[in-house]
């Protein structure tokens, strides 16, 4: 550490504006983040990433702005206390020299926004690790007090060098808050990259490219600030950070360019085909559910054409998962009269056919008549792997030839092509 002015009896302590700046910036960031979430209709993980990133960016940017302005214009920090006592035999400028771990400030007001009035003596917690006075580290300008304040005035002609030694616990709210905001920002960055990766390679590349440009721009502003003098790096980077944050709601609420009817229809078709809704969190879940179903059908050697037909009967807006049923599990299945056992089962006999995406009527092929479907009961005879899903609203055109029935879907269903794992139970009274 560069040599700093020696602290003396009567020198002042201060907290500065760091905590107040970070709190104000974090509040502003939270409001801006909420506006972005509202403009994009983001939910879940995406909303959390936006809010966390906005809070961190707002707090850290405002801290840099205030720090830069204070340095450039030498803005006075409000005095919160005065050093008392001091060495009994070492003097600086005819005033008692101050020692860490021994000497104190009479009180500390905690202004602005650091802590309530500290009505009892406040110990000096830091000093030089190489210069000692009466066996104690010599206190100097910027040495911390146990309340988190620092010594703000010192000798004009006596300086003390060496690294800093801390001899007491410091209630450093400013440092803790700054570290917390940095951690929050890194967590938001990691979450954003994870969501982008789940959305696809193109999204991940775009996020990385934009992030790289922003970091490069901040580095250039910092270099420019260093050339102009102390404080300008913080000021330039802080202003840029708040400006980028302020543009967020405008960019999020920007209306897309007008498209032709043909383009709109093509876009709607692709969005429906690939489960794109504009809600990233929803889209990630949708694609994950679809991938789970596709992998299951492939693992069971289902013909690709049949698998695609089965996929059309699943509502990927709801969870899709693979489960293993134990022996003795009761299930039910609707079948046309005289038809063989199928692959789809329901968990409750109270579920209606239309809720399973099928017509309640079926064709009795032996009599060539249209009759209500029969509900048969089954019980698992061994462990069996099934696909649990929710039936999608669909038009059943296969139950009755020449008819299309609009089934509403919405019920839970299980799929398995291992028919030998399900034993048909006798009907009651038979």
From Swiss-Prot:
It is an enzyme of class 3 (hydrolase). It comes from the Bacteria. One of its GO terms (cellular component) is membrane. The chain crosses the membrane at residues 17-37, 46-66, 193-213. GO terms for biological process: protein secretion by the type VI secretion system. It catalyses: NAD(+) + H2O = ADP-D-ribose + nicotinamide + H(+). Keywords: Hydrolase, Membrane, Transmembrane, Transmembrane helix, Virulence. It is a multi-pass membrane protein. InterPro entries: Ntox46, PAAR_motif. It is found in: Membrane. The keyword Transcription regulation does not apply. Its main location: membrane. Its EC number is 3.2.2.5. GO terms for molecular function: NAD+ nucleosidase activity; NADP+ nucleosidase activity; toxin sequestering activity. Interacts with Tsi6, VgrG1a, EagT6 and EF-Tu. Type VI secretion exported toxin that acts as a glycohydrolase on bacterial target cells and degrades the essential dinucleotides NAD(+) and NADP(+), thereby inducing bacteriostasis. The activity resides in the C-terminal region that is initially neutralized by the cognate immunity protein Tsi6. This is NAD(P)(+) glycohydrolase toxin Tse6.
